[in-house]
Design a protein with these regions (language model features):
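Membrane-interface segments at or immediately adjacent to transmembrane helices
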Residues: 108-174
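Transmembrane alpha-helices and immediately adjacent membrane-cytoplasm interface residues
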Residues: 68-74, 80-116
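Hydrophobic alpha-helical membrane-insertion segments
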Residues: 9-25, 96-101
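Active-site recognition of the HExxH zinc-binding catalytic motif
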Residues: 54, 225-246, 250-251
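Post-HExxH zinc-binding segment in Zn-dependent metallohydrolases
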Residues: 128-133, 240-284
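Membrane-embedded alpha-helical segments of integral membrane proteins
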Residues: 15-76
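Auxiliary, metal-adjacent structural segments of Zn-dependent hydrolase domains
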Residues: 149-218, 222
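Pan-zinc metallopeptidase signature
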Residues: 295-387
Length: 387
């Protein structure tokens, strides 16, 4: 029994983690009243302390753990330790971390949808709605694509990471004035270590709720970095679902005072909508792309080139693992949830930018004598009934 203690501890924490997820799913309305606030408060407190380090603390912890596991394998062989005892004490800390991760951040997957918090109506969109939204985001992206600073190769030039974090913070501050749901921690977003490894895994950014750290892979093409930073901070703001983090990241970019952030947000919004349009109507997709500016085309090609550079079995396997992780938290679409942001982007366009075709009616003015006591009787709007 002594040799199974670690395995028993691991099993207990796995069971507790599963129980937490079931409770979060079952009582999501009740939990949504307090959990997001508690989660954001925890990440703000821990993130403020961890933010003093330029490196990602979780990466250091991961390296130490991996080295300890490898060293323990050698010790197990030399000292002839019981295999199940060794396995238990490896699995125990992993299961404890998984439990704590779910406790302080993971239950955000069961929060109410972002559009409900924003009181944004998300209708079932048509191809016409999608085309209009795609055209709008392309128009905005075209406008900013010629305004951002570029180098001799035509690539977007970024400011240093500290300055980008300041801009990001102000961008979310602007957004909070309209929607208080975006109040909370702002990072700072760190540069992700092991950039080449992360690129081979298809990782542009990562947020670890347990340490309150958001990080961005600076190896990605520069035009997408501001959007990715805003996306990762959205995870700190308790938006766990990838489509909602994408939408929050776009809104932060749109509300930014910096044209590079705005361009990054509109570029990604256009690409998400265009990809969905391609799936439903290739001809319209081709028509849209014909209107793209040369600068935007250059950026899209640079993004594709960077992706092609790292594509392979490693990225495919990493995608499958992350897909499984999302499914375990109830996101049956897996990694496809990233592109689900299209519905939110179309809804935002309809709510904010689609021209209103209904005639505006003058509001009633109680101080206007003619309105209060009209000289002519009001016109009947329905046909009179026969006696």
């Amino acid at each position: 029994m002594r040799n199974l203690r670690g395995i028993i501890i691991a099993a207990v924490f796995v069971a507790l983690t599963i129980l937490l997820r079931l409770l979060g799913d079952r009582f999501n309305v009740l939990m949504g009243m307090a959990y997001p606030f508690a989660s954001k408060t925890y990440m703000e407190i821990v993130g403020t302390w961890v933010g003093k380090f330029d490196f990602c603390l979780w990466q250091i912890i991961l390296v130490v753990f991996c080295v300890a596991v490898v060293a323990s394998i050698g010790l197990m062989i030399l000292n002839r330790w019981n295999f199940f005892r060794w396995l238990g004490w490896v699995l125990a800390p992993v299961s404890i971390v998984a439990f704590l991760f779910t406790l302080v951040w993971g239950l955000n997957y069961f929060n109410k949808p972002i559009h409900e918090s924003m009181k944004l109506e998300v209708p079932d969109w048509s191809v016409t709605d999608l085309r209009e939204a795609t055209d709008y985001y392309l128009e905005q992206a075209n406008q900013y694509s010629v305004s951002v600073h570029r180098d001799d190769n035509g690539d977007v030039i970024l400011k240093d990471l500290d300055t980008l974090n300041e801009i990001l913070s102000h961008s979310y501050d602007n957004l909070v004035w309209e929607y208080s749901v975006f109040a909370g921690p702002r990072g700072p977003v760190k540069a992700l270590g092991w950039g080449n490894l992360c690129s081979s895994l298809g990782c542009d950014g990562v947020t670890i709720g347990l340490t309150g750290e958001a990080a961005v892979n600076m190896n990605q093409y520069t035009a997408t970095v501001p959007f990715t930073m805003c996306h990762e901070v959205a995870h700190l703001l308790a938006f766990a679902r990838e489509d909602e983090a994408n939408f929050a990241g776009f809104l932060a970019c749109e509300y930014s005072d910096d044209m590079t952030f705005r361009y990054s947000g509109y570029l990604k919004a256009f690409l998400y909508c265009a990809d969905t349009l391609y799936e439903v109507d290739v001809a319209q997709w081709e028509e849209v792309w014909e209107k793209a500016s040369q600068e935007l085309r250059h950026d899209a090609q640079a993004m594709n080139a960077e992706l092609a550079r790292w594509e392979g079995k490693t990225m495919e396997t990493a995608g499958q693992i992350y897909d499984t992780y999302l499914v375990t938290y109830g996101k049956t679409e897996g990694v496809e949830t990233y592109s689900d942001v299209t519905g939110l982007l179309v809804a935002w366009y309809i709510d904010q930018y689609r021209p209103d075709t209904e005639p505006e009616t003058e509001p009633f003015d109680p101080t206007d004598y003619e309105e209060v006591f009209p000289t002519e009787p009001p016109q009947e709007t329905t046909a009179p009934t026969e006696p």
